[in-house]
Curated annotation (Swiss-Prot):
Keyword presence, Ribosomal protein: no
Protein family: Belongs to the amino acid-polyamine-organocation (APC) superfamily.
GO cellular component: membrane
Topological relation to the membrane, as annotated: Multi-pass membrane protein
GO biological process, one term: gamma-aminobutyric acid transport
Designated name of the protein: Amino-acid permease 2
The organism's taxonomic lineage, starting at the top: Eukaryota, Fungi, Dikarya, Ascomycota, Pezizomycotina
Amino acid sequence: MSFSPPNKSADATIQITEMTRQGTPSSGEAAASTPSTSSTESGDKALEALGYTPVFKREFSRWSSFSFAMSISGVYGTLMSTWIYGLQAGGAAAIMWSWIIGGAGGWALAYSIAEIASAYPSSGAMYFTLKFLAPEEQVPFLCWIAGYLNLVGTVAGGASTEYAASQMLLAAVSITSNFSYVPTPTHVVGVMIGLTTIHAMINTLPTAWLNRLTSGYVVFHISVLLGACVTLLVQKRHDMHDLKYAFTNFQPSSGWSPPGFAFLFGCLTPAWIMTGCDGTARIAEEAKNPQMVVPRAIANATTFTYVIGFFFNLVLVVCMGDPKDLINSPSGQPVAQLFFNGMGRAPAIFFTLCGFGVMNLVAIPGIQAGSRTIFALSRDNLLPFSHIWVRISKRSQTPLIAVWTYAVLEIIINLLGLASSTAIGAVFNVCTVALNVSYVIPIICKMVYGRMQKGPWHMGKYSVWVNAFAVAWNTFMAVIFFFPTRLPVTPENMNYAIVVFFFVLIFALVFWYTHGRHYYTGPLTHSPRATDMSVRTPVGV
């Protein structure tokens, strides 16, 4: 396999004088002043204005970018994987209200990310934007911390997706055996290793193949979700619940006081599902007209996920019967058990396998987005041995070494599953906390320093309110997700997310003070600040 060497031209950035910022023209002015160019040229010009030389082929269109964003959330499969958290937090009412409130926080965060991604379309995503949003003297340190948190959150997110997909496949096997087979942690980890390897192999294909793979995802996803809901509702079981039960029946069992506090733990479900919304921003260098296509994909996919997730939750709650039967399911998958109770064996196997299929289609673009994170951080010399991870394959024009590195990291972190279900639960929590903190840092900088130049997609006068809610809610939830979900605390139910998170944070700080501050100056672009912003308004979108 032959590789092209990393771009070394960025090494001279420190010697280049900062260029004068120019005001951002309105969309109409920019459209009038910008010559008619292809969507690829528009994206490349935007990237060059940010200081990077394009190295990826732009294969992702408006539709495939939206489909990619939908696949990152994968609400059918991801909700099946995390529904247990709301169920244990308080049953029906906890599930519904945690989705409504927690989902609103995720929606605000996604829109805040979309707005910033429109202004700075780069594979570095939110980490990279700090170069433009923070004061110059603070950029190196803030980028360093945000970059490492984003990386560990991304790896934890990919790892938890692979683990959840493995659980779902084995749940289908358990149902097939009439529950005589009970999945063990060893079995789940073994399947996870196989799935991760397959998904990494798929990511060695050229971007055009990945574009085709994700393009049909939305149709499949919606069809499966609607099919499952209709099949459940037409059964007319005697133990179906009404809407009052769905929104008012609260069964606390966590030991927390007041009991209503426990419902916050159910917010992990919408947080985990929506928290990877910047994954689409990481393919900005592979998308056509990324200044509009990427933020639209993020915003539309998140809104769709929020709305359709509400109705899917409602159907599951109405049809769930006795919650204790689901929590104690031998398959280890409450929603799979719900399907079995409500539909029968054959349909339950089918829809559980569909969930497994959806999770595969979440994991594949997850590796793509994660490998681009490693590439972007390495391009800026943030990671050890960056010159290795940044290499691009001449055959596929993708960062193959970064792909396999990311896959290996997923496997390593999932080995925690061999310890206990509590330990693997920490992976889900770390994903949400680390990613959300890495997102909140640039949003706070945007609000405090007022340096952001608007891209063509923005929220106008509502921006500050949406940003403020996103920061407040997700900062609050980052603290909540460190709490143990049950009292009294024992070694078995301890939430080890706080241990993992602060281990990474302390490592990043120590590495910064011993090494990073001596050479890392922030994203290595051709110029310290953006130059001609007029290229940000795309043509033909």
